[in-house]
Regions:
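Bacterial N-terminal signal peptides that target proteins for export
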Residues: 1-9
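Catalytic cores of phosphodiester-bond hydrolases, prominently lipid phosphodiesterases
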Residues: 23-64, 68-332
Length: 332
């Protein structure tokens, strides 16, 4: 079955000027399906190779980073660290050392090449675990330090008025928190660059509610994507999922089509399928496990066919290879 993606005409500009796109080209919702590397960082002193694994399948790719605000108990100095959960030691990597420094050669190569057809090539998905104003401002400063790499919009007087995206190699997404919107958007001056884009609010008290109940708002200048657990597709989520059915596919398509009609990218998390032993050995979580390779591939294929923008998984290499195979078949 062929994917039902909406095509968008890319605007090609001469020289080194970034592409200015109003939700068109590769950045347009519904244009491409990416592997989203869930929890792509070390923790418990293990799994230090996760970012290498995520990048091994090539670009474009999405990478999730969880951020905490750490305060040294002796010096009382504070900084942002990449971590999974407390307790924190202060020895955790920062977003700069773990993520930005690692992707530097990839981004600089992309900037030199002049081929912007696949930009953004890396989506950074921020899961901000603690929202101290100082933490949010520190995150924003780290993004400003890499501003020449990052896809931006222009802060408008009315948030409902979307400015075109200036496309660069990296796109930064974050959560639906109003506290984050305050720092990342509201406190900016009109005309300033918007460096990170929030998720729309999801009203999922009933996860199987109608799409317009779950997500009633169109994309605005700051909120440009929709993040969902899988239980909005299959009741009960991964651990209660049975065989994949046409009814499930219709539900998935409804959610994806609704998001794209609202001008939103859509992400689903987290689609794994492995043995209990493999899940434990790799630091993956049972509540995301469909239980088998066959079961998760049914969902990966369905997500690809429906045009899900970001498929989050812990099985980076497997999903990247599977998407490559599906694209190859689709091109025939």
């Amino acid at each position: 079955m062929r994917r039902r993606f909406r095509s968008g005409a890319a605007i090609l500009l001469l020289g080194s000027v970034p592409q200015l796109l109003a939700q068109t080209g590769a950045a347009r919702p519904g244009t491409r399906v990416l592997m989203d590397a869930h929890n792509c960082y070390p923790y418990e002193g293990r799994w230090n190779d996760r970012i290498e694994r995520a990048l091994s399948g090539g670009v474009p790719v999405a990478i999730e980073q969880d951020l905490y605000w750490y305060t040294d108990p002796i010096t009382h100095k504070s900084w942002s660290v990449v971590a999974h959960q407390p307790p924190l030691s202060g020895k955790e990597p920062t977003l700069t050392t773990y993520f930005f420094d690692r992707i530097r050669p990839i981004v600089e190569k992309a900037l030199r090449s002049g081929d912007r057809s696949k930009w953004p090539i890396i989506t950074l998905n921020l899961d901000v675990k603690t929202e101290e104003p100082e933490h949010l401002r520190a995150i924003l400063q780290m993004l400003k330090d890499h501003e020449d790499w990052i896809t931006t919009a222009t802060r408008t007087d009315d948030i409902r008025t979307q400015s075109p995206l200036t496309i660069r190699p990296v796109l930064v997404l974050t959560g639906q928190s109003d506290a984050q919107q305050q720092i990342f958007y509201d406190d900016l001056r009109p005309g300033d660059r918007v460096l990170v884009f929030g998720a729309v609010h999801t009203f999922d008290q009933d996860p199987m509610a109608a799409t317009q109940v779950l997500e009633p708002a169109r994309a605005n200048n700051y909120r440009r994507w929709w993040n969902n657990p899988w239980n909005v597709v299959e009741a009960g989520g991964q651990m209660q999922a049975g065989a994949w059915t046409p009814k499930d596919m219709r539900r998935l398509r409804m959610l994806v089509d609704h998001a794209h009609a609202q001008g939103l990218w859509i992400r689903f998390y987290t689609l794994d399928g492995a043995s209990t032993e493999a899940m434990t050995r790799n630091g993956w979580f049972a509540n995301y496990n469909f239980g088998s390779e066959a079961a998760v591939k049914d969902r990966w294929r369905a997500a690809y066919q429906a045009g899900v923008d970001y498929i989050a998984t812990d099985q980076y290499e497997e999903l990247a290879a599977y998407l490559h195979a599906l694209r190859s078949v689709n091109r025939r």
